[in-house]
C-alpha cells in the first residue's frame, strides 16, 4: 500500500512539475510575443511619424484591432496584453517625436478618441465619461 501511494505521489509531483514548466514556457512565449508586437508597433509608428512630418504638439491618431493583430476577425479575440504592447510601442514613438497620442475607440463607443488631458485641453475637446 505504501509503495502504491509512493508511485501515485511521484506521478502527482511529476505532473505538477510538468504543468509548471509548460506554464513557464507559455509565459516566456507570451512575453516574447508581447515584445515583438511592441517593437513592430514602435517601428510602424516611427515610420508613419517620419512620413507625416508632424510638428510638436500635433495629434497622432491610432486605431487598431487587437483581434486582427492576433490574426483573427475584428472583435473575436480581444486581448488586453496585445493592447498594452501596441500602446507601449506607439506611445514611446510619439513621445520621442513630441506629439500626442489619440487612441480611436471601436464602434461601440462611436469611434471616440481617448487622449491625454493636456491634449484635450490644448485642442478644446470636451471631456466625457463612458459608463
Kindly give the residue locations of the regions a language model identified.
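N-terminal glycine-/serine-/threonine-rich phosphate-binding loop
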Residues: 27-60, 80-92
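Glycine-rich beta-strand-to-loop/alpha-helix junction loops that act as flexible
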Residues: 62-67, 104
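Short glycine-enriched, charge-decorated loop/helix-capping segments at active-site entrances
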Residues: 74-80
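Ligand-binding beta-strand-loop-alpha-helix segment within the catalytic cores
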Residues: 97-131
Amino acid at each position: 500500500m505504501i509503495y502504491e501511494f509512493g508511485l501515485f505521489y511521484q506521478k502527482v509531483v511529476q505532473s505538477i512539475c510538468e504543468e509548471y514548466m509548460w506554464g513557464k514556457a507559455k509565459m516566456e512565449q507570451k512575453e516574447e510575443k508581447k515584445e515583438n508586437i511592441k517593437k513592430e508597433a514602435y517601428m510602424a509608428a516611427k515610420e508613419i511619424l517620419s512620413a507625416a512630418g508632424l510638428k510638436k504638439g500635433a495629434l497622432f491618431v491610432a486605431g487598431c484591432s487587437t483581434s486582427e493583430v492576433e490574426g483573427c476577425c475584428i472583435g473575436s479575440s480581444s486581448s488586453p496584453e496585445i493592447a498594452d504592447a501596441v500602446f507601449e510601442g506607439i506611445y514611446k514613438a510619439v513621445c520621442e517625436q513630441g506629439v500626442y497620442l489619440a487612441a480611436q475607440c471601436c464602434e461601440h463607443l462611436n469611434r471616440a478618441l481617448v487622449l491625454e488631458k493636456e491634449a484635450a485641453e490644448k485642442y478644446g475637446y470636451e471631456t466625457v465619461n463612458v459608463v
